[in-house]
Swiss-Prot record:
C4-type zinc-finger residues: 17-39
Matches recorded under Gene3D superfamilies: Zn-binding ribosomal proteins
Cellular component annotations (GO), alphabetically ordered: ribonucleoprotein complex; ribosome
Protein name from the UniProt record: Small ribosomal subunit protein eS27
Cofactor note (record): Binds 1 zinc ion per subunit.
Gene behind this protein: rps27e
Cofactor(s) the protein requires to work: Zn(2+)
One of the protein's GO biological processes: translation
One annotated GO molecular function: zinc ion binding
Source organism superkingdom: Archaea
Subunit structure: Part of the 30S ribosomal subunit.
Length: 62
């Protein structure tokens, strides 16, 4: 019997807002605009694939 291995190709990213230093999780392939929950600055914008990040990546989670 052959087991199909499923690897996730996308990740969650912990990003830091450049304005208020708030850290929050963002999906790497976000399909909608992601805003900072504290100050409202745009952290990620969809591009049809991986999101365009406007914040610093602190950590990655699979």
């Amino acid at each position: 019997m052959v087991k199909a291995s499923r690897e996730t190709r996308s990740k969650f990213l912990k990003v830091k807002c450049p304005d208020c230093e708030n850290e929050q999780l963002v999906f790497e392939k976000a399909t909608s605009v992601v805003e900072c929950t504290v100050c409202g600055r745009i952290l990620a914008e969809p591009t049809g694939g991986k999101a365009a990040l406007k914040a610093d990546i602190v950590a990655t989670f699979e």
